[in-house]
Amino acid sequence: MSRVVVIDHPLIQHKLSIIRDKDTGPKEFRELVNEIAMLMAYEVTRDLPTEEVEVDTPIARARCRRLAGEKLGLIPILRAGLGMVQGILSLYPTARVGHIGLYRDPDTLKPVEYYCKLPTDLGERELLVLDPMLATGGSVVASLDLIKRQGGRRIKLLCLIAAPEGVQAVQEAHPDVDIYLAALDEMLNEHAYIVPGLGDAGDRLFGTK
């Protein structure tokens, strides 16, 4: 079974309290989502391999550690996942970015793919799938299915807020994918919104509500 890691760093929790607030506007919301994603990335990437190198400082020669050539891929689930990309790229600017677009069929309520553009070397990369809200888990499970069909193997899921129902759905469908969260909330309501959540992340990011 995959691990569920709730990152309870004080800075993350402080910023999360602001984006939950219904009076926080799109500009501040976008900035804080990026900042939270960046802070979460520190924890998520702590197992990246390093190697010892020597460099010349102005004083003497020093032994240091650098990343050992690990390739990273970011895959935001459109559209809300876009809000998490820039914060992580600011830490790891050489990461490749793919995109997956899904919508929910109004009759079947199942996710339908409308866009997919992924790096061609998925199997060589550690992949971070980005979606601010893990509600029912349907879109995330469908995205992970698609990524694995195209060769992705080493995958981690980053979400700001999740409902227990979504976590369970991902764990049952993809027990090899670890899940990193800023908060695990109480439940879903009858409209499949996370309670207490923060509303529709996409609408709040892009000011479309």
UniProtKB/Swiss-Prot annotation:
Cofactor note: Binds 1 Mg(2+) ion per subunit. The magnesium is bound as Mg-PRPP.
GO biological process, one term: UMP salvage
Annotated residues for binding of 5-phospho-alpha-D-ribose 1-diphosphate: 79, 104, 131-139, 200
Metabolic or biological pathway, per its Swiss-Prot or TrEMBL entry: Pyrimidine metabolism; UMP biosynthesis via salvage pathway; UMP from uracil: step 1/1
Domain of life: Bacteria
Catalytic activity: UMP + diphosphate = 5-phospho-alpha-D-ribose 1-diphosphate + uracil
Sequence positions that bind uracil: 194, 199-201
Signal peptide: none
Top EC category: transferase
Molecular functions (GO terms): GTP binding; magnesium ion binding; uracil phosphoribosyltransferase activity
InterPro entries, A to Z: PRibTrfase_dom, PRTase-like, Upp_B, UPRTase/APRTase, Ura_phspho_trans
Record's keyword terms, sorted: Allosteric enzyme, Glycosyltransferase, GTP-binding, Magnesium, Nucleotide-binding, Transferase
Coiled coil region boundaries: none
Alphabetical list of NCBIfam families matching this protein: PRK00129.1, upp
HAMAP family per the UniProt record, alphabetical: Upp_B (MF_01218_B)
Protein name: Uracil phosphoribosyltransferase
Taxonomic source organism: Symbiobacterium thermophilum (strain DSM 24528 / JCM 14929 / IAM 14863 / T)
Gene: upp
